[in-house]
Structure formats: C-alpha cells, structure tokens
Amino acid sequence: MGDHHNLTGLPGTSIPPQFNYSQPGTSTGGPLYGGKPSHGLEDIPDVEEYERNLLGAGAGFNLLNVGNMANEFKPIITLDTKPPRDANKSLAFNGGLKLITPKTEVPDEHTPMMSPVNTTTKILQRSGIKMEIPPYLDPDSQDDDPEDGVNYPDPDLFDTKNTNMTEYDLDVLKLGKPAVDEARKKIEVPDASAPPNKIVEYLMYYRTLKESELIQLNAYRTKRNRLSLNLVKNNIDREFDQKACESLVKKLKDKKNDLQNLIDVVLSKGTKYTGCITIPRTLDGRLQVHGRKGFPHVVYGKLWRFNEMTKNETRHVDHCKHAFEMKSDMVCVNPYHYEIVIGTMIVGQRDHDNRDMPPPHQRYHTPGRQDPVDDMSRFIPPASIRPPPMNMHTRPQPMPQQLPSVGATFAHPLPHQAPHNPGVSHPYSIAPQTHYPLNMNPIPQMPQMPQMPPPLHQGYGMNGPSCSSENNNPFHQNHHYNDISHPNHYSYDCGPNLYGFPTPYPDFHHPFNQQPHQPPQLSQNHTSQQGSHQPGHQGQVPNDPPISRPVLQPSTVTLDVFRRYCRQTFGNRFFEGESEQSGAIIRSSNKFIEEFDSPICGVTVVRPRMTDGEVLENIMPEDAPYHDICKFILRLTSESVTFSGEGPEVSDLNEKWGTIVYYEKNLQIGEKKCSRGNFHVDGGFICSENRYSLGLEPNPIREPVAFKVRKAIVDGIRFSYKKDGSVWLQNRMKYPVFVTSGYLDEQSGGLKKDKVHKVYGCASIKTFGFNVSKQIIRDALLSKQMATMYLQGKLTPMNYIYEKKTQEELRREATRTTDSLAKYCCVRVSFCKGFGEAYPERPSIHDCPVWIELKINIAYDFMDSICQYITNCFEPLGMEDFAKLGINVSDD
C-alpha cells in the first residue's frame, strides 16, 4: 500500500516533482510521458502541495506580498517559459502584484481532473516577451493600445446628457434581444402585498441611470472591450436613489392602491394610465432623504423617468389632482404626471395629456409617431362661450391737435348699431395706448382709395363694374364712420408701402363687423349716383344707402392673386426670380382632370390628376402632373411614372447639404451628415465620407424582420444633390424602396396626402425640388402672418376674403406651426417594405422595420429666414392675443 500510495503531505513521504504552470494545457503532475500508468493513485496531483505553493511556502508559485489586495498584485514578466522564483526579478505593473487563479482543463482521459493547467490571465507576446495582464476591475479593458495588425473600431459610448436608461435596459443590452425574458425573470414583479424589500429591489431595477453612472460605463468601454456594460453599484447617486425609494415605499405601505399604481407605472413606463400617487406635504414643501433636500416630484421624477430634471422646468398634466403647484395637503409624486417644459416644447408627451403645446421648429429633431399638435385650433373654446363680436371698434391713434365739433346725431348710436362704450376697446385689438370713440374721429376730408380691377380667375372672379373713388370711401360703410382716415399711416419699415395696396373691394371695415350688406344695383345710374354723392358735414349722417359688394362675392382667390397681395404686403424679398403672371393652369389635354384644393386659408389651387386608363408619352404638357420634371418623363399614367434617366448636373461643392437619420420602426439608430454631391446608403461595413453603411449600426433589440431587410439592402440607394438644389434618388438594389415627401405630394396631383411612391431596382426619381418647396413654405408662412394680422385688427389685402371665413378657420391658419411644413424639407425612404393604404399592417412609415429620413438643409434655412423676417418686422401674437382667442398659454 505504501508503494502505491505516495501522498505528499504525510509524514515520511517523499516530495514528488514540482508542477510547471508556465505551459498552459499540459501537466507533469501525472505519470511520466510515455510511461504506462499504474493502477494505483500515482496520477492524482498533490493538492495540498499546490495549496502550500499558493500560500508562498513552496517554489511552484512565487507570491511576494501576500497581505496586499488582489488588485494590487504585480504581473509576471519573463523571457522563458518558467515564472521567476526570485521576488526581486518581478517588475511592477499597475502598482501591485498578480494573483493567478487556476482553471481546470481536461484535454484527455490521462489528465487529472484537478490539474491546474490554465489561468484566467491574458498572455500577450510582444518582441519575445511574454506578459500576463492582471484581471483588475474589468478583465478585458486593459489593452487600450491594440496589438499590431489589429484594427479595433472606436467604442460606442453613451450620450451622458440625453440617455434615459434603466438597469433593466442595461441588462437587455448585455443579454441581447433573445434574452429579454431572462432579464425580466431576474427580478420578479411584486404586488402591493409583497415585502417592502422585494418592492424596493424591483423599483431600483427600473430606476433611471444618472449621468455619473453613464460616465463610469463609458470609462470601461475601451477599444478592445467595446461592449463592457459593468455597472458599479457603490455609486453616490445610487445610494441616494435607494434611500429615496425606501422612504417612498415606507410612506405608501398603508396605501395599497397608490403602491400598486407605483409598481404599474414603473413597469409600463407611463403607457398605462394611472392615478395620483400621493404623499403628505412637508412644511417647506421639500423632501429630505439621505442628507439631501429636494422637491418630491423632482426627486422621484429623476428616479424613474428623467435623467435630469429641475422644478422650474416642470409642469403637471391636466388630470393630476394633487400636483405640487396646487399647494394641497397631499403631493403627487407620479413621475408621469409631470412634464419637462423648455419654452413651448414639452419633453415626454403622451396621448392622454391634452395640454401638449406644439414643439418649436427644429431641424434635427427625433421624429416618432406624430401627435396632433400642429393644429392649435383644438384649444379654442366653442362659439357658445366666446365673446360676441362688437360692431364698433377703436384703434390706437395719436391725439389729434384739433377735434371737430360733434353733432348730436353722433352722440348716440343709431338704432341698428350696438351700444358703444368709449372706454372699452375691441376685444381683438392690440394693447391700447390712447383710445377715442369712433364718433370723435377727425374727418378733415374724403380720402380717395386707389382703384384696381381685380384680375381674378374666371371661376373665382367678381362680375360687375369697378367702383369709383367715391365709392371706395371707407367712411360710408355701414352708416358709421371708420377710423381709417390715412390708409398708409400704419406701416412698417421692413415692407415697401405695407398698406398702400390697391383694393379690389372698397369696404375695408373692421373684420369682425357683422353688419349685413345689401346687393348692389348694377346699373349706370346707380353708379353715377354713388359717384356724385358727397358726405355730410358737421356730424350729419348721409341718407344714401350703404355701398355694398357685387352679387358674386368670392370666398377664395387664386394662388397668383394671393402672391401678388404678399408682394404688396411683405415686399419682393422672397419672390426673386419669379414672374408675376397668372399661375392658373389651363387644360391642354383631356387625359387628366382638375381637382380644387385649398392648402391655405382663402386660396384655391388647381391640381391636375391623370384620368384612369389614360397615357401620356414622349412630350409632356406643362400643366400635367409632375410638371416640374415633365422634361425628364417618358411615360405617365395614373399608376406609374417612367423617367428617362437624365437629370441636372450633380453639385461639385464639398459642403454639408443634408442629414440622414436611420430608424428601425420608431427607434432612431444613428445619423450621418451628407457632404458630397452623390451620397450612398448601403448595407455594408464601409466607413467613408460619401457613404452611410447601415451594417455598422448596432441595435441589441433588433427584430428578425429587420435582420432580413438589412441583409437585402446590399448596394442600397444613392442620393444626388444637383446644382439647382434638387435631390434625386436612385435605387441600386434588386428590391424596391418606398419613398414619400412633400414635394412628391405636390407634384403627383390630386388631393391625396403622403402618397407613397414605389421605386423599383435601377430606377431613379426626383424626390425634392427647392424651387417648388420654397414656394409652398413661403406661401404657408405668409398666409399665417396675414391671418394673424387680421385677428389683430390690422388691414390686409385679404380682409375681404377673411370676412367670409369662420373664426375657426382663421385661428387654425394663424396658429399654423412650422413643423407642419417639415415634410417639404425632408424625404423618407423605406427599404423593401411598403406602407400606406396598400399595406394595412403598416399604415405609417414608423411601422417599417428599416427606413431613413433625409433632412435637406437648404429648405430648413429658407424656412428659418422667413420666420426670422416675420418675427423682426411684424408684431406676433402676444399672450393677451392668445388669451382673447381662447387659448390657454399661462404658466402653471
């Protein structure tokens, strides 16, 4: 027994040969190489000897400072295959020694199971020197300088300012999309009756990571280890969140409903409607937790929703009954009952929040599912609760030097007029300076308004003789004198002769005057009688009937007439290079029909649409659909367009002309600037200045259908920026792409909005034209300003049209947002998968697995220039004007 059981560590036994650990994968602890193994226990390694070596008693492993911490051990750097046995030969690295942890490897049946043949140490070979890297903090993050010949991409770092991520989201990034269920099973979802520590553990798992933690995550993401997502638990912010969470759960232990609401709202991230979660209000309104004070709704908003949040930038939603600003005994701490407000932009809007205001115009916003915030008319109360319009109104004027005598007839209103209070101004007028009643306005003489026969389209024009200068006298309107004694008195320096426009209609009375008009007597005698009429003096009311409009009173004008009015009001700054001739479309073929559309208030546009079954080939008429690119079209039907393949010359300027944003459904993955004339978007892995390779964009929660689409992209598409400012798209795939843009909506004809164009492989199409898009943007913004001036009680050339419109239409036009015009500045492309009416499962492009959006800088710059011009030269709607319109814009 003693011959076969030679165990080391027992008294009187011989010491076997030492193990050599410098050659991973081999062991000399068993029988000799080539020798026949015996049936005894000679091949069992001496575990006790190995443990003594670890403690520094033997010579197998040489530990220099056993008392140091594990991450302070020095590595072993040697020139041969054996570790140094002298402590003085070890070199310092990272300020400490190295602890080698054995790892079991079984290459064959002869190798002992307990043989320590490998370690977790990283061994690098450089210039004949073998260096072992210690596993401190992060085992894969030490080699910031990659090995020779290995090109590692730069790490993907988090945006520490704008990233809202929870610990659960971090686990999803670690495990990937297939293991989402495993991440959910990591912590079981409790209910209100669960132990408090389980609830706190669950709530902390879904807390929002702070900026310091994201910075710490970025610090561990080196070039070698780009996917390191190790979260340090001993963080100061995490300790504070832990205490705040424990304090809230303790306060809600007797309110099971509120506690359950808290669990539900954290799990659903606000998608599920929940009520208020209330805690008692303190004396100073602040909450003290872990030695720090803060407002309760801010503390818990930062805990579960926002990365950064302050009290002055928050407001509560309408359905919150115990908001912090209400000063009630209970304070709601539901993080999804508060929003962050930056100017008029609201972060974190939801469907059930009815107070969302339209966001400001942004060039590089993150589009998602569009909410109906472009129309502020839904904030306007119904007509039943609005103040009635007044028949008389005053306008702020400088004090006249001499006031004429006022007759007794003007001292009291006429029977058909409403009583007038001299001290009350019109409800829609601008803030008053000095007001005078209308019956005290000076009447020095009769001004003569200039005359212009309105060159209107036949379908919208007025029939009847033009009125004489006396008929244009505004003092004869509705049996009372108007205060417009000098038409050019109110003008701006920015526009040439702002109110010196020729008027197609004489009665420029106040827009809110609702006095009925009598039909005119279209005869020469009646015209001569009106022309020979002289107004009364010394306050006498003339007995002649009031001047009225022709029988056919148009409610709209053509686009050409509206643009002429805009030139007279705003100048020619934004109309350079355009002719003033009529833009009316004259039908030259019976192969297409005309449809009437009103894109802006009071203006009618004729849109041609191809008749079903008709075909246009070779030479395209200029009034056909796609008239902007008719010279590049070979064949046109109601279902398809065939381009010739030609186009304008590509721009050779090396400047950033656009931005491409890449999405997978509603999730934005990445973006890249376009700086060359031809810019490619493909599915490869090439980094280039004129190429955006989608294969380089990671997404840990990518869906299987997105994998299939990305695999089919291959050569992708090409955007060509032309010298005339247009953008063309060429499909270089064998699968189709689906394109939509505001420019294509305008060119395709008909009244269908957001029309989807299917572009087959090797085909091209013009997706953006600057000349057409800038006209649409300019007309919409100038129409908005016209409606705003009308609501402010100012004179515009469109007053006679706006009088026929409802207040709802005018307010909708005056509150139009620039975001509603953003579709004329961008192009959206979906790869392989279609959307729209033909695809019920994907009604919007946001439902497509892989799509991109091209934002064109020149269009946004033009929109910005118009907005800045209007802001600097004209008085916008103020807070009082919005209040008079019934729109609540007051601060909470």
Curated annotation (Swiss-Prot):
Residues 1-43, 135-161, 505-552 are annotated as: Disordered. GO terms for molecular function: cis-regulatory region sequence-specific DNA binding; DNA-binding transcription factor activity, RNA polymerase II-specific; I-SMAD binding; metal ion binding; RNA polymerase II cis-regulatory region sequence-specific DNA binding. The keyword Nucleotide-binding does not apply. Keywords: Chromosome, Cytoplasm, DNA-binding, Metal-binding, Nucleus, Transcription, Transcription regulation, Zinc. It holds the Pfam family MH1. It is found in: Cytoplasm; Nucleus; Chromosome. GO terms for biological process: anatomical structure morphogenesis; BMP signaling pathway; cell differentiation; cellular response to pheromone; dauer larval development; defense response to Gram-negative bacterium; determination of adult lifespan; negative regulation of transcription by RNA polymerase II. Residues 657-880 form the MH2 domain. Changing residue 296 to L: In mg125; suppresses the constitutive dauer arrest phenotype on a daf-7 mutant background. Residues 15-26 have a biased composition (Polar residues). Its main location: cytoplasm. It comes from the Eukaryota. GO terms for cellular component: condensed chromosome; cytoplasm; heteromeric SMAD protein complex; nucleus. SUPFAM superfamilies: SMAD MH1 domain, SMAD/FHA domain. Interacts with R-SMADs daf-8 and daf-14. Interacts with daf-14 in a daf-8 dependent manner. May interact with daf-5. Belongs to the dwarfin/SMAD family. Transcriptional regulator and common SMAD (co-SMAD), required to regulate entry into a developmentally arrested larval state known as dauer, in response to harsh environmental conditions. Probable component of transcriptional regulatory complex with SMAD protein daf-5. Acts antagonistically to SMAD signaling downstream of TGF-beta-like daf-7 signaling. Binds to the 5'-GTCTG-3' motif found in regulatory regions and may modulate the expression of genes involved in TGF-beta-like daf-7 and Notch lag-2 signaling. May regulate gene expression outside the dauer pathway. This is Smad protein daf-3. It comes from Caenorhabditis elegans. The gene is daf-3.
